[in-house]
Design a protein with these regions (language model features):
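Acidic/glycine-enriched connector segments
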Residues: 2-3, 10-102
């Protein structure tokens, strides 16, 4: 399972992220050895997801946006690349964050 863990940059609830991610993985009947966290390296949910991955001993693949090459389009381009790579996605959205919404 290639799992995007994403969300708003203000998201900081480590315990909620851990609980929801682990519950989702259990629901999918996947072992941790078959999980790879996919991260867009943004502050907030993305980096908390990376941290969960490292602590849990799963692989972590990062997709940093290339701001120099793509300018303002870098975020959406990175998001599309992540979506094409991943098999699953969990988003911690506050109902406001435009980046998390996309």
């Amino acid at each position: 399972m290639k799992l995007i863990i994403a969300g708003g940059r203000d998201f900081s609830d480590r315990l909620l992220l851990k609980k929801e991610v682990e519950a989702f993985i259990n629901e999918q009947s996947v072992s941790l050895s078959d999980v790879e966290v996919v991260s867009g390296v943004a502050k907030g949910a993305d980096t908390l997801g990376e941290a969960w991955g490292f602590v849990s001993g799963v692989k972590v693949k990062i997709f940093p946006p290339d701001w120099n090459r793509h300018g303002k389009a870098a975020g959406p381009i990175r998001n599309r690349e992540m979506a094409e790579y991943a098999t699953h996605c969990i988003v911690f959205w506050d109902g406001k964050s435009r980046g998390a919404k996309s």
